[in-house]
């Protein structure tokens, strides 16, 4: 049972299953592993960070990838490969969101994401029994639209500024400890670190 009236959800590894193996296989298929695997190529991490902060567009990202790799590949190929990171949002989680809303909970989404991932989620992953993404959440906060990302304190402060949610009545669910700590320290939210993909569902029991 969740006793908080405001619940702020992360996206990846909380609602959306992340398929890193599928992503790396897609990169390998295009010959991009050494360029877009952040573990192998530090520039890739910087490029994705700029994309996640809204500092470059998807087209600019694709141009950078072609420049780095020297490969003759299309924007669509790059976008499709990047979106292979996204698995599914299980129906049980969509049902859980709808149940929480029906109980009068105020639901919010706060995600470090990128436009191509978000577009895919909106079109392919969130639709359910006639519901669209805006039916699940009162407000949606995305790093690339806010020009801020977690765990920077200002992103949490901006959510509070826009929503007016009270710290003592707010639960933040995120898979990363650093984000949970920052949310608690900067705005006083109660936090739950979702260490395994389905863990937060036990809060509903």
Q: What are the residue ranges of the model-derived segments?
A:
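Asp-based, Mg2+/Mn2+-dependent phosphohydrolase catalytic module
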Residues: 1-4, 9, 114-115, 122-205
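N-terminal helical cap/lid subdomain that shapes the substrate entry/recognition surface
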Residues: 2-91, 102-103, 114-117
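Generic structural signal for small/hydrophobic residues in well-ordered secondary structure
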Residues: 10-13, 54, 100, 109, ...
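Short amphipathic alpha-helical segments and helix-helix/interface helices
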Residues: 24, 94-98, 109, 156, ...
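Generic hydrophobic alpha-helical segments
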Residues: 47-51, 97, 137
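A generic structural motif
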Residues: 104-106, 189
